[in-house]
Amino acid sequence: MKFTFVTLFDNLVKGYFQDSILKRAIDKELLSIDYLDPREFSDSKHKKVDDTAVGGGAGMVMNPQPLYDALDSLKKEDEDVHIIFLTPVAKPFRQNDAKRLAKRSHIAFVSGRYEGIDERVIEKYADEVFSIGDYILTGGELASLVICDSVSRNIEGVLGNSDSLSVESFETPLLEAPSFSKPKLYDDTSVPSEYLKGNHSKIRSLKLALSECKTKFFRPEQLLKHTTRKSYEK
């Protein structure tokens, strides 16, 4: 899988791939990372990439010319590239999107800055547009990394243990059950006794009950999906 980050600030992105799981995936050639700076495509004397908003409004907007030329260059290099824009004015990114996108060969993330990107760029080049939540960031780079990370861990070989994927939150309607480590007793608090007895059937039952409790508290709408699924399966 190749990821291309179309960004004015590639240093914000590069550091994320210097350690841990994604670094190992790059070393194993499961992932490759590239960067494209719209400034390099600006036809203005001072490599300007933004301008005031037409129709009024605060702040500057990324203007179309540098992005048109940058994305044309990207598509000329690889016509199968899947271009994703990040903006809070979009559908929310979900786990199912991560699994689906993991089957792609090349994804490009276009990160906005200032007050956003000229809408004509999005209309012309976007294969998909995502939001990662109902809040505002100073730029799209963090949102791009969130999606890149989520997609990457669904690519075969990136995670050391493929079983990790099947038991995570959002693989089913329920949130994942709580996890515990050693020591068994710490700060006068013990790991649940059923976890210690080795009865895997009872452990599974307890984990299911804990998952349902956690889901009811944090994400009650997910619990409704779980209840509906169980009724349908009957």
Where are the predicted features?
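Structured adenosyl-cofactor binding patch, chiefly the S-adenosyl-L-methionine
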Residues: 121-163, 168
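S-adenosyl-L-methionine/SAH cofactor-binding core of RNA-modifying enzymes
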Residues: 63-113, 119
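Glycine-rich, flexible N-terminal cofactor/catalytic loop recognition
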Residues: 2-40
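Hydrophobic/aromatic beta-strand patches that form the interior of the parallel beta-sheet core
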Residues: 4-6, 34-36, 82-84, 107-108, ...
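SAM-dependent methyltransferases
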Residues: 183-234
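Internal, active-site/partner-interface "lid" segment
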Residues: 142, 154-193
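Short, structured active-site "lid" loops
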Residues: 49-70
